[in-house]
Regions:
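Conserved beta-strand hairpin/beta-sheet module of binuclear metal-dependent hydrolase folds
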Residues: 1-54, 136-151, 169
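Structured catalytic core of nucleotide-sugar glycosyltransferases
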Residues: 6-17, 67-76, 96-100, 123-125
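Active-site metal-binding loops of divalent metal-dependent hydrolases
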Residues: 9-10, 40-42, 69, 128-131, ...
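Active-site metal-binding motif and surrounding structural segment of the metallo-beta-lactamase
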Residues: 33-34, 43-91
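Active-site neighborhood of phospho(di)ester-bond hydrolases with catalytic His/Asp-centered motifs
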Residues: 37-41, 61-70, 90-93, 148-151, ...
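Metal-dependent catalytic neighborhoods of phosphoester/phosphodiester hydrolases
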Residues: 74-85, 101, 232-239
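Metallo-beta-lactamase
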Residues: 91-144
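Cap/insert and terminal regions of metallo-dependent hydrolase folds
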Residues: 158-256
Length: 276
């Protein structure tokens, strides 16, 4: 029994992550995994291609959960596909009204507290600051394994640190390098928004948060997501972690805008043939 995670793409041009959860039991040994997508910010074509690289098709997506409704996390083009495949989209109630103007009503599942999917999956949300409408982080739990996921958060509140305990893996935004942000050729109001505490996390803020979370977890994987194309680069991020958190650096994966990460496993090894 295991959880697999792949960030299909992450950045200002689009975000989507596959979480594939082993769904076998003694009565149904050949049952395929439960496939969950976090966010729908990539094009249909790119999502299909990147899923197929992991042996998953669109019609094998069982559910979607959204962090928030910015277009790099939800593209309106998904509306008809979600309807056609009858894929439920779980949306926190703070975003549900706005989502109804983008998605078909019958695909929207509004929630406030914990979500239970199948009999084995629990998703516990936490509200976070981002621009005016906020964003939602999650702990996804199955088979006694726990994945923490949060992106587009302006700062790391105590509520998130209290929520993200006993994790086996974490995916957290590491959006910008402050020096690159200040030097960037972009309007001052954009820089202020990003760095305001209601915009995005810097590399140092992400490292500090994950270091604190790691002290109360047993992390197999650390995945950094939503790197700014203009104000960050993987080399800067990797160097920071090598210098300040070398033990965690060995478990580090930096997500890319243009290619999916490998399937990262939480739990005991499972042969790929058994998964898909």
């Amino acid at each position: 029994m295991s959880i697999h995670l792949s960030v299909l793409g992450s950045g200002s041009a689009g975000n989507s992550t596959l979480v594939s959860i082993s769904n076998q039991d003694n009565g149904q040994p050949d049952r395929r995994p439960f496939n969950l997508l976090i966010d729908l910010g990539l094009s249909l074509k790119q999502t299909r291609l990147r899923l197929e690289g992991h042996g998953v098709s669109i019609d094998q997506i069982d559910a979607v959960i959204l962090t928030h409704l910015d277009q790099d996390h939800l593209r309106p083009v998904w509306r008809n596909t979600l309807q056609a495949h009858q894929i439920p989209v779980h949306i926190h109630q703070i975003h549900a009204s706005a989502a109804s103007r983008i998605l078909a009503a019958e695909t929207i599942v509004s929630y406030e507290e914990e979500i239970k999917l199948e009999s084995i999956i629990k998703i516990r949300p936490v509200q976070l600051a981002h621009d005016t409408t906020g964003t939602i982080g999650f702990v996804i739990e199955a088979h006694s394994k726990r994945l923490g996921f949060a992106t587009d958060l302006g700062h790391v509140p105590n509520e998130l640190l209290e929520h993200f305990v006993d994790l086996d893996a974490i995916a957290l935004e590491s959006n910008y390098d402050p020096d690159m942000q200040r030097a960037a050729d972009r309007p001052a109001f954009v820089k202020q928004r990003v760095m305001s505490g209601h915009g995005h996390l810097s590399n140092a803020e992400a490292l500090d948060a994950i270091t604190r979370i790691a002290a109360r977890s047993n992390l197999d994987h650390v995945v950094l997501i939503h790197l700014s194309r203009q104000c960050n680069c993987p080399e800067v991020v990797s160097r920071l972690w090598q210098q300040q958190a070398p033990d965690l650096h060995a478990r580090l994966t930096i997500a890319d805008q243009h290619a999916p990460t490998e399937l990262l496993q939480l739990g005991p090894p499972v042969a790929m043939a058994e998964l898909f």
